[in-house]
Design a protein with these regions (language model features):
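Active-site-surrounding "flap" and adjacent substrate/cofactor-binding loops of secreted or lumenal enzymes
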Residues: 149-150, 166-169, 174-240
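Intrinsically disordered, low-complexity linker/terminal regions across diverse proteins
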Residues: 356, 362, 382-397, 402-409, ...
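Short, Gly/Pro- and small/polar-rich lid/capping loops
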Residues: 139-159
Length: 825
């Protein structure tokens, strides 16, 4: 039976250069582990959760996504590319040793100047009844009253605490010592923590929405119907099993055939540039990364941009260091098994795979490491297409762009290049490589995505690879993958269904008020800073005043005609999952490329409501932690509940707000002005002062060793997030203290706990980061992450906090109250 597919038009009709405005301001999602490029300069790559979920599809998600879910995709990669290296820069589960049993209800004692100070947070004799523990649905569905919600929260907090631990020795152990025992890592995950727990709750809600019957009044052109059809097609395993690999084989044939499957493949007609452009139309960047995004030096203008490629393993070191040989061998075995499932003989698959791996290893050698790409001002080169062709004459850039842009491209067209040396080295490498190997590699990177849209034989092979790479013991249930796919690719349609049923406007207004208070705290701290000159301080104040905040959701998602317009050219059928995915990828590519010629509209939403995370965009000077988060996103426990004591809300979502504000002034955010443009606006004196204080944090975190795997944290790569963590908690606590002074009569305690409001602030902050991760995933994250492990986000931040030391009466010189502290903001 001949299966249908969406063909690539090799000679598309031209479109006029001036594009009409679109309501998508961001469509491209980077390769989640290989460190791809600068494409996200305009996006929210400074996120709060970060890179804690290494099992997230390695480079399977290296395609356009409507709503860039960077909860782990900040990107997983080392930044072999500009953007991934600077995932927080450019503009986007905690390591914990399982503890022994604890004594419920114990108080602890410490000595301050030989005086015993009792700081019992858990009431004596308090016990926990697991049967009474509510799931997160109870919270965000609005069930319960003040008393019941607070009782439930107290039980949860007590459940995770190790009350035998001394908070002045190790506050993470004190706050989270029972987490691992109470929450073993599920077999389908590489790690498990608070965020993953929230996501599972959210995914269950989204599944219910997607499975609800389609109202009879809606037709197939309705965006929410298309989202439901996409979910149905993904879940219809009987059809997937019947079709097997045929849809992919047909598509590969249309693309010229995958040599590994075709011994008769003819190299004479092979055109690597054409195939690269064809794959780009399916939102896949291989060899060269191309995208349309705001110019980092003129954030109001969209421009074509190029950068180095991503790779198929987490970092270039996986290809280049002998210590990673086991992972490279597993990668090759994965490739061979996929090829044989698609019909290759074992002999041919093995021979071709060895050639392909050798080529990708050479490719890794010409990519730049993250350390080499820290100064993105030096990487930035703006030029015309004609000038680029002069510098790299082996590539017909006009032809490539004419295919991708679906219009004639002139030599005068401006482009920004972030990896000129890489591109020049690439064409030399290609000239020395057999066409068969290049074709094999290009299509392997494409096939690796597309097998996710086939039957479970391919998922079983991928699971074996992921077990070696991340330690994940089994693949997630199909419904979880399907929910993720629909929410990533049709996030606004899903968000429309979600917001109509669950969004809480009161939470939105309350959070906005908190944000204003925390912004005020930052301004006060900034004004008291002695190491910044007055002129720089004035400009920084202007920047924080200009910082915008998006809360909730864009209005258009509740207006069916506007929402339907967004997806009008996307054809979705309930029984064609493979073709549906291709249609979406092509749609997202068109939308992205169509941005060229338009002025950047910084008020547009590019994130969907139903996601758990928070973000700061340097190019827009904008916090959008809530555009993706609504009530079943990050505005739910432990971050927020309208019935919580204010201490928990400030220690939860308040710290998130402060974290994102501080990203505007971290090691990369400070380079962008109030309008989101990259230029030198700090005085030399202020720059020197910043570097001195940032170096203190770099050195501090670099001393932390993750005992489970015997590896140290990379203090340089994590500095931006560490700066944001340390600044965020200071601002949030300052705002909370002000609220306390104005609301002395409010009850800031929890039933069954004797903790003060200020103690609960820090305890809730710490419990946000309770979690554990498999050793394999831990090793990978320490090599690639821009966030410190959760344990050290707690210890590192609180050991620098004078407020924490005072609230918990920690003696000077104790581990959580060192004499020498680090502080930037």
């Amino acid at each position: 039976m001949k299966t249908s597919f969406v063909p690539v038009d090799l000679h598309p009709p031209p479109r006029p250069p001036q594009r009409r405005k679109r309501d998508i301001d961001r469509v491209k999602n980077g390769d989640t582990i290989a460190g791809n490029n600068t494409r996200d300069l305009d996006e929210e790559l400074d996120n709060f959760v970060g890179d804690y979920y290494p099992e997230v599809e390695v480079d399977d998600n290296y395609e356009s996504s409507e709503t860039k879910d960077y909860y782990y995709s900040e990107k997983e990669g080392e930044a072999t590319s500009f953007n991934d290296k600077y995932e927080d820069v450019v503009v986007e589960k905690r390591l914990k040793e399982e503890s022994a049993g604890t004594r419920e209800g114990d108080a602890f004692s410490i000595f301050i100047n030989n005086t015993e100070a009792w700081l019992s947070i858990a009431a004596e004799g308090d016990t926990i009844d697991d049967d009474e523990m509510p799931d997160f649905h109870t919270f965000w569905k609005g069930e319960g009253n003040v008393r019941s919600i607070r009782e439930a929260r107290a039980r949860i907090m007590l459940k995770y605490m190790d009350k035998s631990a001394d908070p002045c020795q190790d506050f993470y152990q004190y706050a989270c010592g029972n987490w691992a025992k109470r929450n073993p890592i599920p077999k389908d995950k590489a790690g498990y923590d608070t965020f993953e727990m929230l996501r599972e709750s959210l995914d269950s809600v989204l599944r219910e929405l997607l499975e609800d019957p389609i109202p009879s009044k809606l037709d197939a052109d309705d965006a929410t119907v298309k989202a439901k059809y996409l979910f149905q097609s993904c879940m219809n395993y009987e059809i997937l099993e019947q079709r097997m690999e045929r849809p992919l084989i047909q598509l590969l044939d249309e693309l010229g055939g995958w040599p590994i499957l075709r011994p008769d493949w003819d190299p004479d007609g092979f055109d690597w540039l054409l195939l690269t452009a064809q794959l780009r139309l399916y939102s896949n960047d291989v060899l060269i990364s191309e995208w349309v995004g705001p110019d980092i030096k003129n954030s109001n203008e969209y421009v074509i941009q190029f950068d180095q490629t991503s790779l198929g393993l987490p970092t270039r070191d996986y290809f280049l260091q002998s210590a990673n040989a086991v992972y490279l061998e597993a990668y090759k075995d994965y490739l061979i098994k996929i090829a044989t499932l698609l019909g290759a003989s074992l002999h041919n698959a093995t021979v071709h795979a060895e050639e392909l791996i050798e080529f990708e290893t050479q490719l890794a050698t010409i990519t730049s490491s993250s350390d080499e790409r820290r100064n993105f001002s030096e990487l930035y080169q703006r030029m015309s297409v004609g000038e680029l062709r002069t510098l790299v004459p082996q590539v017909d850039w006009r032809r490539y762009l004419s295919i991708v842009q679906a219009r004639p491209v002139n030599f005068s067209e401006p482009v920004v290049v972030f990896a000129l040396q890489y591109i020049q080295n690439l064409v030399v490498l290609l000239s020395k490589t057999q066409p068969r190997t290049v074709a094999n590699y290009l299509l392997w990177r494409f096939v690796r995505h597309r097998v996710n849209n086939l039957d479970d034989r391919f998922q079983e092979v991928k699971q074996k690879f992921y077990y070696i790479l991340f330690g994940r013991e089994q693949a997630p249930s199909r419904w979880k993958n399907c929910v993720t796919q629909v929410n990533s690719n049709m996030g606004m349609a899903v968000g429309s269904m979600f917001v109509k049923k669950y969004f809480d406007e009161n939470s939105k207004n309350d959070t906005l008020s908190m944000t204003q208070e925390i912004q005020r705290s930052f301004r006060e701290l900034l004004n008291k800073t002695s190491w910044i000159d007055d002129e720089t301080k004035s400009l920084a104040t202007e920047k924080v005043n200009a910082m915008s905040l998006r809360i909730g959701y864009p209005d258009f998602i509740l207006q069916p005609h506007l929402l339907n317009e967004r997806y009008k050219d996307v054809v979705i059928q309930p029984d064609r999952y493979f073709e549906n995915t291709l249609n979406i990828l092509q749609h997202l590519t068109r939308v992205e490329q169509d941005r060229l010629g338009n002025t950047v509209n910084k008020t547009l939403w590019n994130t969907a409501p139903a996601v758990v995370n928070a973000y700061y965009s340097r190019n827009k000077n904008q916090i959008s932690q809530f555009s993706r988060t609504s009530r079943a996103g990050i505005l739910q426990p432990p971050f927020y509940h309208r019935f919580f004591p204010r201490s928990l809300n400030y220690g939860g979502i308040g710290v998130v707000i402060g974290h994102e504000i501080t990203h505007g002034f971290d090691d990369k955010g400070r380079l962008f002005d109030k309008d989101g443009n990259l230029h030198r606006w700090w005085k030399d004196e202020a720059i020197d002062g910043f570097h001195q204080r940032a170096q203190c944090l770099i050195d501090q975190y670099a001393r932390y060793t993750v005992a489970e795997v015997g590896m140290q944290i990379d203090g340089i790569n994590t500095q931006g997030e560490n700066i944001a963590d340390n600044g965020g908690i200071k601002q949030a606590f300052r705002a909370y203290e002000k609220w306390l002074r104005l609301n002395e009569e409010e009850d800031e305690t929890l039933p069954g706990m004797s903790a003060t409001g200020k103690q609960l602030f820090f305890l809730n902050f710490a419990q946000v980061w309770c979690g554990s991760m498999r050793p394999e995933a831990t090793r990978n994250k320490l090599k690639t992450a821009v966030h410190s492990p959760g344990k050290f986000r707690v210890i590192g931040t609180l050991s620098n906090s004078k407020d924490f030391a005072q609230v918990f009466n920690c003696p000077p010189g104790s581990p959580m109250n060192p004499v020498n502290k680090c502080s930037v903001w």
